[in-house]
Regions:
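Pyridoxal 5′-phosphate
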Residues: 1-227
Length: 227
C-alpha cells in the first residue's frame, strides 16, 4: 500500500494535480478525501460489492467548475439558443444523456451495506485470513509468490512452475473457486519480470479459512493433473 498521503503532500507543494485510483483499496482502507487533500479520487463499483459498469469520480469543486465537459448531450446544459449555450452546474455538466440509473442505485446500496460493517473487526479478520493464505500457499510445492508483505492488503499473486495461469484458473473453477488469471491491468510490470500471466487471490469479509483449505487441496490436485 503506497503512502498516498505523503505523495499527495509532495505533489501539492509543487502545484501538481493528484488523482487517486482507489479501486483496490476502497473496500479495505477507510478513506477521507478531504483529509487526503487529493484533487480527484476514483474507484469501480464492483470493487465494493456493487454493480459492474458504474463507479465514482470525485473531484474538488473548484477544479470541476473550471473544467470543460468532453461530451455534449441532454441534462449537461442549462440554456441553449441558436448562437450559444451555457453549461449546467456540477456535477451535471459532466453527465450527458441518460445516466446509468439502475447501476447508480445499486452502487449506492452497496456503499450503504459496506458502511454497516465494523471496519476494525473486518480488518483484523482479513489480516488473519491473509496471513493464513500466505502460510498455505508457501506450503505448496512449485508455487512462487509475488510479494507476501502484509501491508499489501488481502491480495496476493502467484505462479506455479510450468503451469499456465489460465489453466490453473479454469480447473479451479471446476472446484467452485474463482480467482483472476492474466495481466491484472498491469502488463508492463509483468513484462519487466518476463511473466506472461499470473494468478491472483483476493480475499474479502465473506471468505473463510475453510475456503483457503479448499484452495490448497484443489491446487495440489491441479498440480498433479497438469504435471
Amino acid at each position: 500500500v503506497n503512502p498516498i498521503d505523503k505523495i499527495i503532500s509532495i505533489a501539492n507543494e509543487k502545484n501538481i494535480l493528484t488523482l487517486v485510483d482507489a479501486a483496490q483499496s476502497i473496500s479495505h482502507i477507510p478513506i477521507d478525501v478531504k483529509k487526503l487533500k487529493c484533487d480527484f479520487f476514483v474507484f469501480s463499483g464492483h470493487k465494493i460489492m456493487g454493480p459492474t459498469g458504474v463507479g465514482i469520480l470525485y473531484g474538488r469543486s473548484e477544479i470541476l467548475n473550471n473544467m470543460e465537459p468532453f461530451l455534449g448531450g441532454g441534462h449537461m446544459i442549462n440554456d441553449v439558443n441558436m448562437d450559444s449555450f451555457t453549461y449546467n452546474s456540477i456535477p451535471f455538466k459532466f453527465e450527458a444523456g441518460t445516466p446509468n440509473i439502475a447501476q447508480a442505485i445499486g452502487l449506492s446500496e452497496a456503499i450503504n451495506f459496506y458502511n454497516q460493517f465494523n471496519f476494525d473487526q473486518m480488518h483484523n479478520y482479513l489480516d488473519s485470513l491473509y496471513k493464513y493464505l500466505i502460510e498455505i500457499l508457501i506450503s505448496i510445492p512449485n508455487i512462487k509468490l509475488y510479494s507476501n508483505n502484509i501491508n499489501n492488503g488481502p491480495v496476493i499473486s502467484f505462479t506455479i512452475e510450468n503451469l499456465h495461469a489460465y489453466d490453473v484458473a479454469k480447473l479451479l473453477d471446476t472446484y467452485n473457486i474463482c480467482l483472476r488469471a492474466g495481466h491484472h491491468c498491469a502488463q508492463p510490470i509483468l513484462n519487466k519480470y518476463n511473466l506472461e500471466s499470473i494468478n491472483r487471490v483476493s480475499l474479502y469479509y465473506y471468505n473463510t479459512f475453510e475456503e483457503i483449505d479448499l484452495l490448497k487441496k484443489s491446487l495440489l490436485k491441479i498440480i498433479k493433473i497438469l504435471s
